[in-house]
Amino acid sequence: MPMSDYLDAGNEELLKDFFSEAEQQVEQLESNILVIEQDPTNRDAVDEIFRAAHTLKGGAATVEMHELSGFTHAVEDLLDGIRSEKVTVDGAVVDLLLTSLDVIKAMLESRAGGGPYAEDVSDLVARLRSYLPASGTVPGAARGLSVSSPNAAEAAKGTAVGEDGTEAPQVGRVPPLSLLSEYDRLELREIVPPEHSVYALTVRFDESNLMNTVGGIQVFTALKSCASVLKTVPDFDALYQDMFHEYVVYFVSTVQDSVCVSQVASIPDVTLSVSVAEVALADLCTPLSEHGELGVCADAGTGGVSEGSGAAVRSGGERVPNSLPKQVAGCAVPSAKDSSKATSSGYGSGSVLRVDAKRIDYLLNLVSETVIIKASLNQSALEFGEVYTLFQNANGAYKERLRKFFDRVPAYLEKVKNGQDADAVRKGMIAEAVGVFDIFSSFENGLKQSVTKFRSSAQNLGRISGELQEGVMKIRMVPISQIFSRYPRVVRDLSRDLRKEVRLVIEGEETELDKSVVEDLLDPIMHCVRNSLDHGIEAPEVRARSGKPAQGTLLLRASNEGNMIVIEVADDGRGIDVEAVKTKAVERGVLHPGKNLTEVEAFQLIFAPGFSTSRSVSNVSGRGVGLDVVKTHIERLNGTVSVFSEVQKGTRFVIKLPLTLAIIQGLLIRVGQEVYSIPIASVIESHRIKSEEINRIDNYEVFNVRNEVISLLRLDRLFGISCDDEVTGQYHYVVIVGAAEKKVGLMVDALIGEEDVVIKPLRDQFTSSPGIAGASILGDGSVSLIIDVGQLLELGLKREILARERREATVW
């Protein structure tokens, strides 16, 4: 069943918004639960947890995910007990909260997949309830708002005289805020815009009305036209049930006055009376006594019903209109800094990208500048048209004057022949010829002015387009905290399973990179983290014998280096034994026994498929199927992964990636008549060599660079391109490219230059082209294929392996 079946088609956007926001709330819950595990007295973290659960519960009710809303009620009860210090936070409570969070994730993923969550959670709900005090509690499934005192329900039944002489709740005598918990009051204060006033409307309904069970919904719908309904008592779920409620209290925020609000809420034959009390925002942060005084009453008049727009639930089942101002609609997010944190998950809307409004404003400003440049270029086009007309006129006059000049040449010659002074005749001819060329003077001046203005406009256009490109790319940039925030839970659970003590340190989580890159980094980093926990960091007793602290340290760090992002996963564990790696490589046939490797080269062997030095296989790792996946993933992103280690000091994985995959800087090269692009990030250096500098080893071409032998690949042969041997026979251009410690020289016909390259994916029959990563359209309209350096390096490595096997076969 598609998600749209749960709501009408008009609320499809509401579902998308809910899933996007649910990601943030789940991340908030998980991160802060781990915080209170370390520091149970952290009140800010407790409040954040309660706030996130409260918001998630309300959002679930909005999109009719009742199983999620009901279960989150139970979780919220336990959180309320923690917040009120009735429940002590210990390991068991944290485990229960994390287990409940896993169920919430499963519910979200199930709904995103098209169906409700079918598993029975009654046992888990019972465990949640078991921590609550036996008396004075209100079951979460039966309430939408926390009640501050046992008399709160009765408090709503104060009396006032309505228009028909009946008695209605008198909010002046019974404060509306006494119906709310301290948290509910704080939440009201947080979500109300400063320009809005808050009112508590107590509405009494006519039981004699044939449709009395929907009276609460009718008033809610009417209020949407002039106010934002923040909370209701009873909660919104209860209003939807087939049950008559004599009194309902609506907490609303609006820019309208109390008279207008009360008139809208008064519906003939539905309501008997409406009382309105204004709620001061300052009082929302003031703890109330059991019968504290608050509010000024205004008797309600009667008024017509105004139809409103659709509504969304804010929290606790209370709905908020879809047409709310942005500052209200966005208030469900706990804080501005949290709104930028999103985690990748199966239920999240991967296409949703939250962008800082300042970045949008910056782009709009640039767009306005492009309008100015457009007008300037249009003016230049008109001026060039005028200059062209001037040129045509001057050209016509020039031809006519030149014809007349040549017609007069015989006359000048006749004068010399008749004995006139030759110098005088020559001066006359020169004077007439100069007059002919002076015709172009005005054209030349006009052309210079037009070219100068056009050049200035072109420079401004280049500047603005560059800034626009940078600004648009920044829109896609998201903080890496979106994935870093996933690992505290992973480290906690794995370290407990492995019975190790591990402290996770995260640095540089504000570092930004392209969203598409972030989504593809989760698994590679996860493999590195699991490898460090399982193979790197030792058990506490082993660390103690080595003189290390019992608690190991795992570091996650992100930083920028130019146009690259560097991600490090480091531990202070046992490190990698180089000799053990070499021995294992020889056993697996990956390495020849007589081959001498540097430490760096030996460390790269651990990325070979199926390679593992572990003597046992665990649930975490040891099968050798992890690090080769890391390497494959990272190289697919045009990045590199390296490992550095020292025995008994630790291991460090270093991942380097371009900030974005959409636009790269490329080195344009020519092979035959074809132009290719090589990512600048992969280019080490370039050379121009003579044919005699090329040597052969086992029928493979190599050349020497500072006493280092570099393998050569002729791109013309690799891609099947015919070249003119007469042109390429004497000198060759070689571009040395590399990743990690691997290098190869690409032999090309010419180096064209550097250029920003927009990557377009290849489709259909071109997707399997070896050595090609994509394509780009150049400034002249031609297509340039982008070289996949990683695949070319693999090709070079395979050639070396084949050559080594041939040598070994010859020896044997």
Swiss-Prot record:
Residues 418-661 form the Histidine kinase domain. Signal peptide: none annotated. It is found in: Cytoplasm. Residues 1-111 form the HPt domain. Residues 663-798 form the CheW-like domain. One of its GO terms (molecular function) is ATP binding. Its EC number is 2.7.13.3. GO terms for biological process: chemotaxis. The keyword Cytoplasm applies. One of its GO terms (cellular component) is cytoplasm. This is Chemotaxis protein CheA. The lineage of its organism: Bacteria, Pseudomonadati, Spirochaetota, Spirochaetia, Spirochaetales.
